[in-house]
């Protein structure tokens, strides 16, 4: 396998079985800070609300969201905010300066704007959320913590994803791949050079993710980015375990989407063969396209 697209390797000493620790979705420190509303937090909240990049978000950021950011600043994960990177239906992503002077991405899910039913479709059936309730705030918190846990698991399995750094309530801090002035590009935005090689890297990442017990669930050229010749898988919030009742359906859809894109780019790719490659025995190394 070529390293032309910067394939990473699995972390040593990691083995994956069927063990899944339940993810706690109860109130965290950010909720307690928001309830206390001490003077330091109030002053921080007002400064943040007055910042230009947050003025348009005052109607959707509740006190607990500001408290989550406050706690992440206290813990040294965020030193200063930059501008917005992207604005989506459910979350906004901001550039920020991390505690080690590295650029980080801060993904803030908006409780009131998130698609509650869409999230529940991916959470129900996940063994990590067997006792998830119906409160909208709790569902969004579960979604964010699931994204953080999925990123950690994918990284250990040798899948190139943004490195997860910290999570508080509905706020996720992770590695920023590229910077605003030199941002990473979605594959949908570029003409892929050497599409066969790129396809082989992506399908290997899909197989590693599956062996780690996860299915991305929404993989396509819109959730694959490239920066400095490196392919990165993003948006793992909806990724489900292989035990999810819809895992096979999601995986087959991922395989079709990925294969169709790379075939249009000129690669020898087929959805059914990709599915066989991803789900094949660990000892197999077939090319999946014959």
Swiss-Prot record:
Disulfide bonds: none annotated. GO terms for molecular function: ATP binding; hydrolase activity; metal ion binding; protein serine kinase activity; protein serine/threonine kinase activity. Its EC number is 2.7.11.1, 3.6.1.-. ATP binds at residues 85-93, 107, 175, 177. Keywords: ATP-binding, Hydrolase, Kinase, Magnesium, Manganese, Metal-binding, Nucleotide-binding, Phosphoprotein, Serine/threonine-protein kinase, Transferase. SMART domains: RIO (SM00090). Residues 11-22 have a biased composition (Acidic residues). Autophosphorylated. It comes from the Archaea. Serine/threonine-protein kinase that is able to autophosphorylate as well as to phosphorylate proteasome subunit alpha 1 (PsmA1) in vitro. Despite the protein kinase domain is proposed to act predominantly as an ATPase. Belongs to the protein kinase superfamily. RIO-type Ser/Thr kinase family. This is RIO-type serine/threonine-protein kinase Rio1.
């Amino acid at each position: 396998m070529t390293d032309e697209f910067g394939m990473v390797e699995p972390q040593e000493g990691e083995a994956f079985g069927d063990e899944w620790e339940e993810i706690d979705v109860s109130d965290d420190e950010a909720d307690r800070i928001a309830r206390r509303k001490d003077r330091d937090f109030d002053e921080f909240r007002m400064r943040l609300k007055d910042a230009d990049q947050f003025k348009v978000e005052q109607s959707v950021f509740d006190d607990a969201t500001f408290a989550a950011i406050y706690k992440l600043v206290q813990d040294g994960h965020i030193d200063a905010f930059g501008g917005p990177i992207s604005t989506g239906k459910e979350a906004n992503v901001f550039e920020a300066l991390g505690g080690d002077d590295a650029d980080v991405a801060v993904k803030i899910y908006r409780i009131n704007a998130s698609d509650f039913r869409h999230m529940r479709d991916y959470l129900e059936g996940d063994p990590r959320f067997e006792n998830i309730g119906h409160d909208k705030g709790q569902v969004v918190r579960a979604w964010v913590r699931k994204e953080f846990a999925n990123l950690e698991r994918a990284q250990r399995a040798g899948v190139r994803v943004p490195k997860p750094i910290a999570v508080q309530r509905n706020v996720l801090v992770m590695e920023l791949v590229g910077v605003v002035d030199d941002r990473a590009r979605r594959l949908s935005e570029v003409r892929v050079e050497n599409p066969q090689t790129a396809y082989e890297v992506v399908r290997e990442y899909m197989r590693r993710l599956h062996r780690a017990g996860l299915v991305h669930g929404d993989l396509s050229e819109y959730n694959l980015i490239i920066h400095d010749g490196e392919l990165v898988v993003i948006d793992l919030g909806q990724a489900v375990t292989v035990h999810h009742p819809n895992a096979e359906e999601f995986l087959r859809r991922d395989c079709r989407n990925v294969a169709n894109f790379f075939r249009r780019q000129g690669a020898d790719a087929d959805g059914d063969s990709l599915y066989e490659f991803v789900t094949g025995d660990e000892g197999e190394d077939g090319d999946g396209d014959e």
